[in-house]
Amino acid sequence: TNTTRPINNLDQKDNTKQILWGDTHVHTTYSMDAFYMSLPMMHGSRGAFPAAFACDYARFISQLDFYVLTDHAESYIPRTWKDQVDSIRQCNAISGNEDNPDLVAFIGWEWTQAGATPETHYGHHNVIFKDYKEGQIPDRPIAAAGALSNVLRTQLADVNRNLFLLDPLNKDYYLSFADYLDAILSTPNCEEGIPSNYLPKDCYESATTPGELYAKLDDWGFDVEVIPHGTTWGFYTPQAASWEEYTQTPDNIRPDYNSLVEIYSGHGNSEV
């Protein structure tokens, strides 16, 4: 049966809302953990996929209305951040009429924090920008400081630099992985005490708490949504972690940034 579903119900007089389907948490292999899992040794994949694949997958496979690139900020280098931004702009450029596109792509990142105790644990947050044009997004992502950042940037490099020795037939993939690890480690840290929008483009910026993240976003002044993600699951969440601890510091709660909170994703459920 070939049934056509109208986009709008024209008989409805007050048709002010429309249900849209999208994904606010899309990773590419620019995220170090995803790159690692894409290596042939892990499950037979063939190396890293470019950001443009996310656009094609959202449009032709998932048939979404929108998606957001939110790779781990801790895995970014200046070149890959530029690649992601360019891919979003290219995706939107081929989406048809700007007033009624077939797909809308947004840019952002995942602030990937984990604390050892409930008092220092804030979890991951997806940072999503309303616009994607030049001058409407930050020059660089803002990562989370702490242990998980160290794993994504330093420890993976220390452990996995010589994987090609275990699988020499696919050594080119592992050498590319090692090159990316080296590029991450060679990115200098941003100088502290300088407003985010005055820092150079090619440094690595981080924030220890949500409040510090919001203060840096304030420096830019762009429209942005920050969605807490996976706050109660995962190997990195300490026992007894709760919103009660999270909200002890007023700076961590910003209604102008936090109008949404994730309840469920494919990773797990915050209600159980």
Predicted features, each with a name:
Residues 1-272:
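Extended, charged catalytic domains and RNA/DNA-binding interfaces, predominantly
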